[in-house]
Amino acid sequence: MTRVLHILDHSLPAQSGYTFRTRAIMKAQMAMGWDVAGVTGVRHPLDGPDVETYDGLTFYRTKTVVSGRSPLKEWREVGALSAQLERVVAQYQPDILHSHSPVLNALAADRIAKRHGIPLLYEIRAFWEDAAVGNGTGTQDSFKYKVTRMLETRAVRRADAVAVICEG
């Protein structure tokens, strides 16, 4: 049986388009006979147990509290998620790592995928740097935009496969 470990920003029971899409993907994989689980990063918004099952889906939570200013805070988030992934991979023994945007998840997953020889799929749902420009919280000529774009490009190049939700 194929075992897929999803690396997520957040998940159910939080309610968002992101969590509903994740649920649909995981349920479709289960319908194919695959064993699936998820790991959420430190940005998951709800308190709860370290391992939570919701709607038949199991999620491992990264409970580390990360502080500091950008960009050190983001690197600490990647480190915390990598440490949690290391623990979960040892226990769960996945055949595939399926990392979902944002890029911080892909950076953490890449470390573990390379260390353990596990194929990595990176699913890009949006370029978060472009979304920041679109909603007025960032600019295209900013340092943060350029670094995020560089990290996205690196993540795509290092992944074994990439999935996108549109061609636009």
What is each model feature region?
Residues 67-96, 107, 146, 150, ...:
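An amphipathic, basic-hydrophobic alpha-helix
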Residues 97-116, 122-131, 167:
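An aromatic- and histidine-rich active-site surface loop
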Residues 32, 92, 112-116:
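Helix C-cap/helix->beta junction micro-motif
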Residues 1-64:
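N-terminal subdomain of nucleotide-sugar transferases
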Residues 9, 65-72, 121-153:
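Acceptor-binding helix/loop patch of EC 2.4 sugar-transfer enzymes
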